[in-house]
Amino acid sequence: MANTKSAKKAIRVIAKKTAVNKDRRSRMRTFVRKVEEALASGDKTAAQEALRAAQPEIMRAAQKGVIHKNTASRKVSRFTQRVKALS
C-alpha cells in the first residue's frame, strides 16, 4: 500500500493510463480483426478498405506507446503484402 501522498497519486495516474492504453489496444485489435476477416473472405476491395481504416489506428497505437513502432510497421507491411497478393 502506498504511504506518501505522491505515491497514492501515482497509483491513480497509472490506473487511468492503463485504462486508456487498454482501450487503444482493444480498438487497434478490432481494426486488425476486420482486416483479417476481409482477407479470409478473399474480397480485395473490402480488404483494401479495412486496411485503409486499420493503418492509422495501428500507427496511432505505436505513436502513443501502446505497441512498439517496429511492431506497427511490421503489421502494416504484412497486411499490405497480403492485400496486394489477393487477385
From Swiss-Prot:
Biological process terms in GO annotation: translation
SUPFAM superfamilies registered for this protein in UniProt: Ribosomal protein S20 (SSF46992)
GO molecular function: small ribosomal subunit rRNA binding; structural constituent of ribosome
Keyword Disulfide bond: no
One Gene Ontology cellular component annotation held by this UniProt entry: cytosol
Keywords: Ribonucleoprotein, Ribosomal protein, RNA-binding, rRNA-binding
Pfam families: Ribosomal_S20p (PF01649)
Function: Binds directly to 16S ribosomal RNA.
Similarity field: Belongs to the bacterial ribosomal protein bS20 family.
Name listed for the protein in its UniProt record: Small ribosomal subunit protein bS20
Native source species: Parvibaculum lavamentivorans (strain DS-1 / DSM 13023 / NCIMB 13966)
Lineage: Bacteria, Pseudomonadati, Pseudomonadota, Alphaproteobacteria, Hyphomicrobiales
